[in-house]
Amino acid sequence: MSTKPLFLLRKAKKSSGEPDVVLWASNDFESTCATLDYLIVKSGKKLSSYFKAVATNFPVVNDLPAEGEIDFTWSERYQLSKDSMTWELKPGAAPDNAHYQGNTNVNGEDMTEIEENMLLPISGQELPIRWLAQHGSEKPVTHVSRDGLQALHIARAEELPAVTALAVSHKTSLLDPLEIRELHKLVRDTDKVFPNPGNSNLGLITAFFEAYLNADYTDRGLLTKEWMKGNRVSHITRTASGANAGGGNLTDRGEGFVHDLTSLARDVATGVLARSMDLDIYNLHPAHAKRIEEIIAENKPPFSVFRDKFITMPGGLDYSRAIVVASVKEAPIGIEVIPAHVTEYLNKVLTETDHANPDPEIVDIACGRSSAPMPQRVTEEGKQDDEEKPQPSGTTAVEQGEAETMEPDATEHHQDTQPLDAQSQVNSVDAKYQELRAELHEARKNIPSKNPVDDDKLLAASRGEFVDGISDPNDPKWVKGIQTRDCVYQNQPETEKTSPDMNQPEPVVQQEPEIACNACGQTGGDNCPDCGAVMGDATYQETFDEESQVEAKENDPEEMEGAEHPHNENAGSDPHRDCSDETGEVADPVIVEDIEPGIYYGISNENYHAGPGISKSQLDDIADTPALYLWRKNAPVDTTKTKTLDLGTAFHCRVLEPEEFSNRFIVAPEFNRRTNAGKEEEKAFLMECASTGKTVITAEEGRKIELMYQSVMALPLGQWLVESAGHAESSIYWEDPETGILCRCRPDKIIPEFHWIMDVKTTADIQRFKTAYYDYRYHVQDAFYSDGYEAQFGVQPTFVFLVASTTIECGRYPVEIFMMGEEAKLAGQQEYHRNLRTLSDCLNTDEWPAIKTLSLPRWAKEYAND
């Protein structure tokens, strides 16, 4: 029997003319409801005259009725406040107590003396007072003493700068609804961005307020850092892997220019076009701009490869237009065939630090006014990376690769092991290479930067054709015998035109002993300034892992469809499903700096799964094999949702967030698919719904979901769980005291007033839940969630599973509520602690067991013995 008193109210229907009735008792909800119904009938009134009983906050008053006795006069004196949970005295009414004194409490103590020492909540004060209370505090200030409150009012005019007070008053509608925790973080980060607010601009402060509160919770830390650097960004752009894509800093594009993925694509296309003609990247000719748009529309290599690399690169939007154009323009021909080489190349040439004022040499390279090579990162020995090492004349790439393979890496393991004569040979080759580069540089200086030619010639040059007055006749690629691909193709015989090798859109790497330069056509390298730096470079023979990896999603659906597959919760998931903490989980996410142990109500489902912390689903992988935890990080995920998953997701939304159901799902009407008119109506309906982004469920599925929901509401405790005030999809973070690992969970619903946790499940066979829960490790979920709740609230909650059947029985969809026994909960607690220790050991030793041992099943052993 519950020791906590429960106060019930049954409102009377207006048509009945009966008064409302209340009852309180130290019992559970169902027993108290039954007692109330019995006493109403016993008093001669009809149950049909009243609505169903609801639980409210327990009132603390003098004229409380006796326990177990109904009171029909209670509503004459008291009424529910706006939250529909707290009782308050009606205006003009007085408690029904002859000994009532307005200045004493229920214990007869003088409230005047007590109120002198009471802590007053800060939430009810004016916004400037709440702001000032959080200023300079490491933790949120929720209550202050009476003297402290007076001090805040006195210090309001002195300690709160006028510009801050004005900004707060201008954004009252935006700041006033904030909880104390959120307001404290805003005050803290505002102090970081504007340490001297008296010298700050009012517009900047209000702009920061808007950007900060409009940003996702997990992006506010990065947003604050960007503002501290002077980058007045309005939001944080992220790459596909979740890293910060940048773009908020000032570049050579000009102040106020919004640099996004579209402008980045134009810069990359400009670099591709700059390979065949000289451009003014800051003042494009209309013909050049038209050709750039065509390159973007074609979306072919090398443009598509370089664009994707800049998009997935952390901070890829920070670079200037000059460095982007120059890096694409000067990239080795054909490097896009192996995307990993593009990543390696960009890591070497993107050396820019002042994005607003790029190096003049880089600008000249981008505009075609200089033929100097791209500056690259300098190694510890003071030399550029291997990409700029020239190759001795007469040595092929294969020979050099073989030599480097047979010789140990002396630079890495030994110091100064190269003979002096070998060093002099390298120096002489380097001098020859630099001499060739200088000659080409001088030749290009004599070419006019702009030629008065028509658009047709410009477009012809952009296609790689030689055009008088535009193309450089001294360029090695125009030497005698070397023509464009179009010219070569036109001059070939008909039999050669149909050769399979000529249909290759891009150069194909052949396994030949000698490699020909794409610019000069010669083998061996060092025949022109271009092949000296590229041909035979051993650096380009290695394959490097790409930095961006596909983020795999963990799956732990709460469905038990088909209990014969006890581990089908890892089969797939919907990233937008709100039914579970484990659904759509993203492994190895970007670490969110501001997440600290506590409970958060405003984190979206997607950002929760992209945040840090170990979840119950990941513990399931550790329990299976630790390597499965790593595998799930890297394995691709098929995000196609099954029909069963859509039904389960819709049911969870209907139960937990009914107000969101219409925003996420559309119940289709019934169509007569036997007729052409019905098929056309269905097709038109689906096309209309496709633009909404909502999930369409059939009329039969919608009817089934509603029946399942009504089945839940028909169960008294189920109705109480659904209607009780609580929080759905809240996120709880805590640290495991034994291993120090950050843990997290996302309960379907918590009811803090009574310390209950509800988890909604659907199953095809509700009877098997009593035994199949162990295969699904729901006892581990119970213990894991309960310990997380206790870490936040200091109380072990009552954890229940509300299980709804998707299979009809006797015309109804069964609904039952289960609770783990003490033995099962203890076993789950021991199990998840064992999993955390295993994870801790794997992280410390970097050893992840992956092999599973297969044993003969019982029937096979019996067969072998026969």
From Swiss-Prot:
Matches recorded under InterPro entries: ExoDNase_VIII, PDDEXK-like_dom_sf, Put_RecE_PDDEXK-like_dom
Biotechnology: Has been used to construct a 2,4,6-trinitrotoluene (TNT) biosensor strain.
Keywords noted in UniProt: Exonuclease, Hydrolase, Nuclease
Residue numbers spanned by region Disordered: 368-426, 545-583
GO MF annotation, one: double-stranded DNA 5'-3' DNA exonuclease activity
Enzyme Commission code: 3.1.11.-
Ranges of Polar residues composition bias in the record: 417-426
Top-level taxon of origin: Bacteria
Biased composition (Basic and acidic residues): 562-580
Keyword Hydrolase attributed: yes
Induction note: Transcription is increased specifically in response to 2,4,6-trinitrotoluene (TNT) and its indicator compounds 1,3-DNB, 2,4-DNT, and 2,6-DNT.
Protein role: Is involved in the RecE pathway of recombination. Catalyzes the degradation of double-stranded DNA. Acts progressively in a 5' to 3' direction, releasing 5'-phosphomononucleotides. Has a strong preference for linear duplex substrate DNA and appears to be unable to initiate degradation from single-stranded breaks in DNA.
More about this protein: Encoded in the Rac prophage.
Quaternary structure, from the entry: Homotetramer.
Protein name: Exodeoxyribonuclease 8
Gene source species: Escherichia coli (strain K12)
